[in-house]
Amino acid sequence: MILNDTAIKLWVQRGGVSPFNPELVNPASIDLRLGDEFINLDNGRQYKRQEITLRPGCAILATTLEYIKIPPFLCGVVYLKSSLARQGLDHALAGWVDPGFSGTLTLEFHAHCPVTLQAGQPVIQLVLQQMIAEPELDYSKTGRYHGQTGPTMAR
């Protein structure tokens, strides 16, 4: 079952996302914004800036501004904002958020056209889903990226 705006706001009140802007809540998702840290996947260089322009063929890791906490009874799926897809940006199919995850999300972007991104702009939508039952071991006990902040290379 996908959470609606009312349930998302309740999740937020229980510490689900920080910082929180109520304008980012949609009927069945919450927008998450771009942070200011990036890793160029071509050369491994790390950047901290308010704006980044991706050239065609460029691939980067980025991070969300928001730190999220997914309780063991929820999971999430991340989708690129369609306005960015229409500009030629792809988000790699690594958009699953396990129950029990806490941290900023690492985003894998690939540009097909020149695209300029601003820190603080909404870039993805997080859709939260209710689990039938809690897992035996949630991500807080098993995950390699639990508690991450900033873009994180593969471990």
Q: What do the predicted segments below correspond to?
A:
Residues M1-R155:
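DUTPase catalytic domain/fold
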